[in-house]
Design a protein with these regions (language model features):
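A short, N-terminal "cap"/entry segment at the start of jelly-roll beta-barrel domains
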Residues: 1-31, 66
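A cytosolic small-molecule/anion-sensing beta-strand core signal
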Residues: 59-60, 75-76, 94
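Conserved short histidine dyad/triad with adjacent acidic residue
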Residues: 19-20, 33-50
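Short acidic-glycine-tyrosine-enriched beta hairpin
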Residues: 69-84
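Ligand-binding loop in jelly-roll beta-barrel domains
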Residues: 84-105
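Glycine- and acidic-residue-biased ligand/ion/polar-headgroup-sensing regions
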Residues: 52-64, 68
């Protein structure tokens, strides 16, 4: 994680682990946090509540993002918003990378 970024290629940060999802904290500021989550097909992050809002931006792959009772089938360039306090989860059908822009916490 860095406090200040001028520029970097996010593709260079994408990595996968067959044993568990990979999460990289890219940036943490007083206004937002940026995280990169990389999952192999079948590595689900089960729906769970979180106290902060997040904007998911799908970079690569296909899967389903759950927010509350809604399920969204997503592919690259899809954007999903999960409000503060909502239940959210990720279920990739293929290898998948997602950029999350989070409310600071």
């Amino acid at each position: 994680m860095v406090d200040l970024i001028d520029h970097f290629d996010i593709q260079g940060r994408i990595e996968y682990d067959e044993n568990a999802p990979v999460k990289h904290d890219l940036l943490k500021t007083e206004w937002f946090n940026a995280v990169l989550v990389c999952l192999e097909a079948g590595q689900e992050i089960p729906p769970h509540p979180e106290p902060y809002a997040v904007l998911f931006i799908v970079l690569d792959g296909e899967g389903t993002i759950t927010v509350g009772i809604e399920r969204y089938d997503v592919t690259p360039t899809h954007v999903i918003f999960a409000p503060q306090g909502s239940v959210r989860g990720i279920a990739p059908r293929t290898r998948m990378s997602i950029l999350g822009i989070q409310q600071p916490h």
